[in-house]
């Protein structure tokens, strides 16, 4: 395919047009007086939103050079959303200002590389200042102020989230769920999170959010690498007899075993998700044991004397709901015995008191947080699909 080339001032001008086109559409949503945008959909009703990254995703320009500029700013918004989860409009406005002033300096004869180095030094200074000004959240009132943003959020819906008992504000979370009613309801459940996601995108159940959600699954816990059909088949048969989906937490799943599980998802014969077990090295078996206590199952390992071919229902853990993204797994409503969970937490706290190495202390604190974490599940409803998405 032949390429169209543009140089110097003309190229910079067309790139800047794309940057401004996207940024001007996004920045109207900035701040407490930010306005909404209406986005046309090829199918279904239009979307009303004041979320910067949602608006940015929809923008494609006819001019290929201007579109390159728009895509550069879109990448800024999407990266900010992925790392922070908010602040996309602010990032877009800052990117527009940096492009505008940088191009102005170049037009006046400044060396582009010196301009870039100056921007990088300024970024370092700004980050240092922001870190000094940062305020740690201190309790439920701080959480309410954060949750009430944007201003369209109602005080009623914010207060519908129950306070997570015996849990610090930093370890609690409130994931929204779609409801069949028009109001908002909530309940509190135990939750555990770790930073491993699904190993195959074919296991996704919600392509729009790129996440896999399993309701009331059984959970296979093992520190082994599963490759053959014979190794995974007993767990599949147990799950199918119980008519429940299967979550596999293992060192790895590959080969025919993975193909069998992926095929079951694609043909809707057996819903399953495979996640690499949390932890690394000698810590992996310890973290799997934490999960086995929380979920009420057993770890399939050489040390426990249980083989994959011997798996039965009593060896599998159970949970209310599992949400798996590309990089994170959230387990809500584990069904383990509370007495055993409390005993495990006391055991970990005793280890924490004896630990002297910072890395060991950090790992133990994380394991305790997973065992004691709670989540408030908010079910959000609306009269129309547009109202539901806005809430």
Swiss-Prot record:
Gene3D superfamilies: GroEL (3.50.7.10), GroEL-like equatorial domain (1.10.560.10), TCP-1-like chaperonin intermediate domain (3.30.260.10). InterPro entries: Cpn60/GroEL (IPR001844), Cpn60/GroEL/TCP-1 (IPR002423), GroEL-like_apical_dom_sf (IPR027409), GROEL-like_equatorial_sf (IPR027413), TCP-1-like_intermed_sf (IPR027410). Residues 153-191 are annotated as: Disordered. Signal peptide: none annotated. It comes from the Bacteria. One of its GO terms (biological process) is protein refolding. One of its GO terms (molecular function) is ATP-dependent protein folding chaperone. Keywords: Chaperone. Residues 154-174 have a biased composition (Polar residues). The keyword Chaperone applies. Probably plays an essential role in the productive folding of PrmA and PrmC, and thus in the formation of the active PrmABCD complex. Belongs to the chaperonin (HSP60) family. This is Probable chaperonin-like protein PrmG. It comes from Gordonia sp. (strain TY-5).
């Amino acid at each position: 395919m032949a390429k169209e080339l543009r140089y110097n001032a003309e190229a910079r001008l067309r790139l800047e047009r794309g940057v401004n086109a996207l940024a001007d559409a996004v920045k109207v949503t900035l701040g407490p007086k930010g306005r909404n945008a209406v986005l046309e959909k090829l199918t279904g009703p239009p979307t009303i939103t004041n979320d910067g990254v949602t608006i940015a995703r929809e923008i494609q320009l006819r001019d290929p050079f201007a579109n390159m500029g728009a895509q550069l700013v879109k990448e800024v918004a999407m990266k900010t959303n992925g790392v922070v989860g908010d602040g996309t409009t602010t990032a877009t406005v800052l990117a527009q200002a940096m492009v505008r002033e940088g191009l102005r300096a170049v037009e006046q004869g400044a060396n582009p590389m010196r301009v870039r180095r100056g921007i990088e030094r300024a970024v370092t200074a700004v980050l240092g200042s922001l870190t000094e000004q940062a305020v740690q959240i201190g309790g439920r009132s701080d959480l309410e102020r954060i949750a009430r943003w944007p201003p369209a959020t109602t005080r009623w819906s914010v207060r519908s989230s129950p306070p997570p008992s015996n849990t610090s504000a930093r370890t609690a979370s409130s994931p929204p769920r779609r409801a069949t009613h028009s109001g908002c309801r909530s309940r509190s459940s135990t939750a555990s999170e770790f930073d491993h996601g699904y190993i195959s995108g074919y296991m996704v159940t919600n392509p729009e959010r790129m996440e896999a959600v399993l309701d009331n699954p059984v959970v296979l816990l093992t520190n082994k690498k599963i490759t053959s059909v014979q190794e995974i088949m007993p767990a599949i048969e147990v799950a199918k007899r119980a008519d429940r989906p299967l979550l596999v937490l293992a060192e790895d799943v590959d080969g025919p075993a993975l193909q069998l599980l992926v095929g079951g998802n694609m043909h809707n014969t057996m819903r399953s998700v495979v996640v690499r077990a949390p932890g690394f090295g000698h810590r992996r078996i310890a973290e799997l044991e934490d999960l086995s206590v929380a979920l009420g199952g057993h770890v399939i390992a050489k040390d426990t004397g249980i083989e994959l071919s011997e798996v039965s229902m009593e060896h599998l853990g159970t949970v209310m709901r599992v949400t798996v993204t590309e990089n994170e797994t959230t387990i809500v409503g584990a069904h383990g015995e509370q007495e055993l969970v409390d005993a495990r937490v006391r055991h970990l706290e005793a280890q924490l008191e004896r630990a002297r190495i910072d890395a060991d202390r950090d790992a133990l604190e994380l394991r305790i947080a997973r065992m004691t974490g709670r989540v408030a599940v908010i079910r959000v409803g609306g009269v129309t699909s547009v109202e539901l998405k806005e809430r």
